[in-house]
C-alpha cells in the first residue's frame, strides 16, 4: 500500500535535536517558518517563479518542477478508509501544470488481507483553474475536481510563533528533520479543515511537519504537513499536504 511505503520512508534513523544543541533546533524552526511563509499562496501559478532546494540530481539548465499535493483521509469506525486528494506537477521550464485527482479506498477483510482500490482522474491547470482532461459523467465528481482547493491556497501560519513545546528531530545523514505540535481546536487551520471536510470529532489535533535538505538552506525543498485528528486501528481522520521540488522529467527542460 502506498501510505505504508511512505511511513517506512519516514521511519529513518532520527537524532533528537536535544542532543545536537539549541543552534540546530533554532535552524530547524527558522527553516519551517520560511516554508510556512508560502501559506497562503492563492494563485498557484506563483510557484512558477519560486526557487526550490536543488541537489546534485538537478541539471544546471533545469528550473525544476514543483509537486503540490493535498489529501484528506477518513475512516469511520467499522467502515473502509477513503482518501481524496489532488496532485499537481508544475513545470517551471514550460510554465505548464498537469496532475490528477485521486480517490483511494482501503479495506481489510476478516483474514486481515488488505484491498487497495485507486482511481485517478487526469487534470491540467490553466490560469489557476483546474480542468479535467477526460470526460467525467458524474457531475458531483466533476464539481469536486473543478472546485478543489489546495491547502496552500487557504492555509495560514501567521500565528506559528505561538506553537510551543514541540518535539524536534533531525537526521543529518539524509538530511531530514521534523517538528510535532499539539494544536487547539481554535487554531485557524483546524477550523478551515473542519469546515471544508466536515470533520465532526472534537479530539485535540496535532500537527507534524517534515522537511528534507539542509535546515540552513534558503530555499524550499521537500515539505510535508500532516494534521491528525484521529489515527488508530479502528478510526482515522487526518489531512496531509506536501510541497516538493524535483528535477523535471522528459525533454522539455
Curated annotation (Swiss-Prot):
Subcellular compartments: Cell membrane
Origin superkingdom: Bacteria
Keyword check for Metal-binding: no
Cross-referenced PROSITE patterns: PROKAR_LIPOPROTEIN (PS51257)
Residue positions bearing lipid (S-diacylglycerol cysteine): 20
Listed InterPro entries: Csa (IPR007595), Csa_sf (IPR038641)
GO cellular component, one term: plasma membrane
Annotated lipid attachment (N-palmitoyl cysteine): 20
UniProt signal peptide: 1-19
Keyword terms, alphabetized: Cell membrane, Lipoprotein, Membrane, Palmitate, Signal
Main location per the UniProt record: membrane
Family, similarity comment: Belongs to the staphylococcal tandem lipoprotein family.
Name of this chain's protein: Uncharacterized lipoprotein SERP2447
Amino acid at each position: 500500500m502506498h501510505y505504508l511505503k511512505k511511513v517506512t520512508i519516514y521511519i529513518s534513523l532520527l537524532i533528537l535535536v536535544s542532543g545536537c544543541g539549541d543552534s540546530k533546533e533554532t535552524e530547524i524552526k527558522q527553516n519551517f517558518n520560511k516554508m510556512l511563509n508560502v501559506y497562503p499562496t492563492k494563485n498557484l501559478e506563483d510557484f512558477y517563479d519560486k526557487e526550490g532546494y536543488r541537489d546534485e540530481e538537478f541539471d544546471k539548465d533545469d528550473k525544476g518542477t514543483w509537486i503540490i499535493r493535498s489529501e484528506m483521509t477518513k475512516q469511520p469506525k467499522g467502515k473502509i478508509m477513503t482518501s481524496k486528494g489532488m496532485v499537481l506537477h508544475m513545470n517551471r521550464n514550460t510554465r505548464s501544470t498537469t496532475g490528477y485527482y485521486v480517490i483511494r479506498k482501503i479495506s481489510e477483510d476478516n483474514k486481515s488481507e488488505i484491498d487497495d482500490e485507486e482511481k485517478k482522474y487526469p487534470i491540467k491547470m490553466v490560469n489557476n483553474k483546474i480542468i479535467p482532461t477526460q470526460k467525467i459523467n458524474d457531475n458531483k465528481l466533476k464539481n469536486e475536481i473543478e472546485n478543489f482547493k489546495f491547502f496552500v491556497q487557504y492555509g495560514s501560519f501567521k500565528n506559528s510563533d505561538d506553537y510551543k513545546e514541540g518535539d524536534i528531530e533531525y537526521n543529518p545523514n539524509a538530511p531530514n528533520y521534523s517538528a510535532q505540535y499539539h494544536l487547539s481546536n481554535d487554531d485557524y487551520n483546524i477550523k478551515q479543515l473542519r469546515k471544508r471536510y466536515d470533520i465532526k470529532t472534537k479530539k485535540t489535533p496535532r500537527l507534524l511537519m517534515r522537511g528534507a535538505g539542509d535546515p540552513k538552506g534558503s530555499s524550499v525543498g521537500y515539505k510535508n504537513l500532516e494534521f491528525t485528528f484521529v489515527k488508530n486501528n479502528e478510526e482515522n481522520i487526518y489531512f496531509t499536504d506536501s510541497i516538493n521540488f524535483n528535477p523535471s522529467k522528459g525533454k522539455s527542460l
